[in-house]
Structure formats: C-alpha cells, structure tokens
C-alpha cells in the first residue's frame, strides 16, 4: 500500500515542477517523506541537466522589452508555447533591458529573481525536463524603437523578431518605422547602408561578379560596368535602405522613410535557431 496520497503527489508536482511519474517514484523511494522526496527530485534534476546539455535546443522564442531583444531556446515547440516558458522569457527580457545586455555573456549574467539568468535557466530547465539556452541579446541606442514579432503559426510564440531604432515624430513616422521592421523580417536585410558593408564582403562579391561575367564571355571593356551593376544588385538585396519596399515596390525603403520624416539609426533581426 502506498504511504503517500494523491494530494502529496499534487503538492510535490506544484513545488518542484516535476512530472507525475517522477513525483510518485520519489515519494516511494522516500517512503512518503515529503522533504526527502523533494531532495531526490532536485538531485535527479541536476543529473538530467548534464544529459540535456548534449542535446540541441533549436526551438524557442524571441522576446522584446524596451530597446532590448532576446532569444531563448528550447528543444521542442511544445515547451516554446508553454505559458511558463513564455513568462520566463519575458522576465529574462525585462532583466536584460534593465541591464542593457548586448551579448550572450551579458544576458547570462543579468539578475532574474535574485540570481543570474543562467542559474535561473538551469533551475527552470530541471523543472521542465528540456535543455534550454539563453541564445543572444541586443540593446539598441535611441529613444524610439519599432518592434515587429512574427509567429510562424497562431499557436506558437514569435520565432522572428525585429527591433528598429529611429528618429521621427508622429503616427506616420511610427507606422513607417514599423513597416521597415516588417520589411527586415521578410527580406532579411543585413546592413542599414552600403557604407556598413565590410570591405572584405564587397571585395568578395566583386570578385565573384567578375568571375561570373568573364565566364559568360562578355567583352573585356564591358566587364567593369557589368560588375558594378551586379554589385549594385547585391546592395539592393542586402542593404535595407536600398531594397524595394514590400509596401510599394516602385519605391525604395529609404524613399518611404524620407516621406515620413524617419531616419533609421540601427536595427537587429533575430530568428529562432538561426545565426
């Protein structure tokens, strides 16, 4: 006969966050000693963390608080859409915003309920039984930010997040900045202006364009102009201000922002599980 009750199992589950079967086993092993059962589950959780460390966490969500955006990963989308996980990620985002975290290392060190985010993560990981990761954080400078969070389906949390820092006044400016954020989410701009593209990237693209042009057998005198045209194509694809707007394909993003009196000063794009 069991030396514990269903109420004991329920209480143990609520206290530790462990599964029903694990709680029953712990109570059986402890001969009904509740405190001993809690200790057994804590030890089991610590052991499981080591096993989970070998697994991959490629699901999760993107959360934003103020000028700060974070990515927190889980192993499965089942956990990603769990309300406790979303609440935990929101706490991490708030703490990261307060600390102006701007890297994974800074994110791991922020204070969440009196302990580091990394310690809180390990504790929460033991509770839910999945590997979790504090993937990255970014904080943009500026008084105004536009946010766009994209869900892949209605039952899942945001998997793509974009944060845009900008200057501009009024509703039209805010709408234009948000449209820019949606543009970045969809077309994945890597740079704000062509001046932001590293020299080594430009040289690599120029070299590839020249090689392709020569292999096509173009006249030697025409090669420089063709190469520059292809390089401009690279800019139009990867530089935000030079992209054609998804809202009005006849205009560039820069043209629409100028019309609204908006200057984008920086942006960041996170996609769950991506670099």
Curated annotation (Swiss-Prot):
It comes from the Bacteria. GO terms for cellular component: cytoplasm. One of its GO terms (molecular function) is translation elongation factor activity. CDD domains: UBA_EF-Ts. Coiled coil: none annotated. It holds the Pfam family EF_TS. Keywords: Cytoplasm, Elongation factor, Protein biosynthesis. Its main location: cytoplasm. Residues 76-79 are annotated as: Involved in Mg(2+) ion dislocation from EF-Tu. InterPro entries: EF-Ts_dimer_sf (IPR036402), Transl_elong_EFTs/EF1B (IPR001816), Transl_elong_EFTs/EF1B_dimer (IPR014039), Transl_elong_Ts_CS (IPR018101), UBA-like_sf (IPR009060). It is found in: Cytoplasm. Associates with the EF-Tu.GDP complex and induces the exchange of GDP to GTP. It remains bound to the aminoacyl-tRNA.EF-Tu.GTP complex up to the GTP hydrolysis stage on the ribosome. NCBIfam families: tsf (TIGR00116). Belongs to the EF-Ts family. This is Elongation factor Ts. It comes from Corynebacterium glutamicum (strain ATCC 13032 / DSM 20300 / JCM 1318 / BCRC 11384 / CCUG 27702 / LMG 3730 / NBRC 12168 / NCIMB 10025 / NRRL B-2784 / 534). The gene is tsf.
